[in-house]
Regions:
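Radical SAM enzyme [4Fe-4S]-AdoMet core and its adjacent flexible, acidic
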Residues: 24-27, 47-192, 196, 201, ...
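Short secondary-structure boundary/capping segments
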Residues: 44, 178-179, 221-225
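A generic secondary-structure micro-motif detector
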Residues: 4-7, 30-31, 69, 98, ...
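Flexible mid-to-C-terminal extensions adjoining Fe-S/redox cofactors in radical SAM and related proteins
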Residues: 195-296
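Conserved SAM/AdoMet-binding glycine-rich loop
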Residues: 1-56
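Hydrophobic pocket-lining residues within nucleotide cofactor-binding pockets
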Residues: 8, 37, 96, 125, ...
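Hydrophobic side chains within well-formed alpha-helices
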Residues: 14-17, 72, 210, 229
Length: 296
């Protein structure tokens, strides 16, 4: 179970919520920007079922620019060190945007490994409808090219990066798999109910129960090539589930990528066919117009 942030630690009952999840022997990832983590650590007890997933979008300058708040990187790093010193499990959650420099990203991954975290969960920024500053997000082709360049830097350096993701999802990011989204693999529940079909699309309605979500959602309406809202998405919430299914079906393929890394040269896997006839309102600007991050 993942509790998303922002900063969910502001919820006054969050320690009790986490305790209840752990009591059921469910793994919980508490996703936080870490602004309050150090002062709240005393409210939590280290457990193999609890992981703090800290939002870090790069090294100091890059992260502070991405979140538009100076000092957040240093605060997050301090919180990571404090949590690790107390025996908590910690990972980093990194979103990559347009204009990333592969060397800078590789430098961040190298640094993150020195913090004693279990791994980095990474995902390309996706232009979902209600996200601000739509021009900073990545299209699918640009995402794959970026990840190949990042992995090439790591391979050249012989870096030992640990990712909190399956090897075939990494292979997908590098452009070597033609995956369709599996949105039901990571369902979203909030105060409005069970969100259809995933946490990134917020205008598709809600279900009152998980059973209703699974049985009444028209899953075939969503995914790359099926819905223009989904066309540039490569987010882990939809594709990690697909990668896990592929891993179960083809364990040797997954093992090969785990041992030797993703292929970084040559043709990429073909994109899925486009079956929809147009562009939905609110979908992000075309990939050709995506530029570097700018801040007012």
């Amino acid at each position: 179970m993942s509790i998303p942030g922002g900063e969910p630690l502001i919820h006054k009952e969050m320690p009790q919520i986490v305790e209840g999840i752990i009591a059921r022997k469910k793994f919980v990832y508490l996703c936080t920007n870490a602004l309050l983590l150090e002062q709240k650590l005393d409210q939590y007890t280290p457990s193999p079922y609890l992981t703090f997933s800290i939002h870090l979008d790069g090294n100091r300058e890059r992260h502070d620019k991405a979140v538009d708040r100076e000092g957040t990187f240093d605060k997050a790093v301090s919180a990571i060190k404090a949590a690790r010193a107390r025996g908590f499990r910690v990972t980093a959650n990194c979103t990559l945007y347009a204009g990333e420099d592969p060397e800078d990203v590789a430098n961040f991954f190298d640094y993150a490994m020195t913090l004693g975290i279990e791994g980095v969960m990474m995902s390309p920024g996706y232009s979902y409808q209600h996200a601000p500053k739509q021009d900073v997000f990545l299209g699918r082709r640009k995402s794959k090219e970026l990840f190949r360049e990042i992995f090439k830097v790591g391979k050249k350096r012989k870096s030992k990066w640990h990712f909190n993701q399956s090897s075939l999802f990494i292979d997908f990011l590098a452009g070597n798999q033609s995956y369709q989204c599996t949105p039901w693999a990571n369902p979203t529940y909030n105060v409005f109910g069970w969100q259809k079909p995933c946490y990134l699309l917020v205008d598709e309605g809600y279900a009152s129960s998980f059973k209703e979500l699974m049985e009444t959602t028209d899953w075939d309406k969503y995914g790359v090539g099926r819905n223009p809202k989904c066309d540039n998405c490569m987010a882990h919430c939809g594709y990690e589930g697909t990668a896990v299914e592929h891993t179960i079906a083809s364990p040797l393929t997954a093992l090969n990528v785990f041992l030797f890394g993703p292929r970084l040269d040559g043709e990429m896997a073909p994109e899925l066919p486009v079956l929809h006839g147009g562009q939905a309102p609110g979908v992000a600007i075309p990939v050709s117009q995506i530029g570097r991050i700018t801040r007012d």
